[in-house]
Amino acid sequence: VPAPETLTSAKELMEPYADKSPFAKFYAKKSPFDIRHVTPTIMLGADKDSAAHDSGKQLVWMKADGVVDVPQVMHRAMLALGCDQVMMEPVLRRAGLSISTPGISYASIDHSMWWYRDVDINQWHLYVQDTPTAAHGRGLGVAKVYTQDGELVAAMAQEAMIRVPQQ
């Protein structure tokens, strides 16, 4: 897996589009996280790689954008918030959609997390994401979160509703 420092940040990718889209503006200017996709991002369009599309797999590095000096419970809360920013991407990828698909709407139906170790949101974490299923307007995203040293710190699952206007 490429080191996060070698990858382009979501902030850099979205900066040119910040004036055209509220979504792009959020990632370029307001996201509290430094997000770097190993698997090509679907922020700007659907995935053209059929292998990634078919599997729904995705790898993403993430950490706080800046230094956070708060109690452990807040580091965990920030990890939960951060995962929510990328959790549905594998579901959309598998469905052949992207975050920028015109008229798309999606919402979390259920979200669960399991903690195995303390989290330092100031350090890079690798989100190893997958989607076992995406069909009939619903999808299930699952992820394991690892430290840069390969320790599992958390696992999560999120079910979502996805709607795309009929063409």
Model-derived features with residue positions:
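Terminal targeting signals and extreme-terminal segments of soluble enzymes
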Residues: 1-167
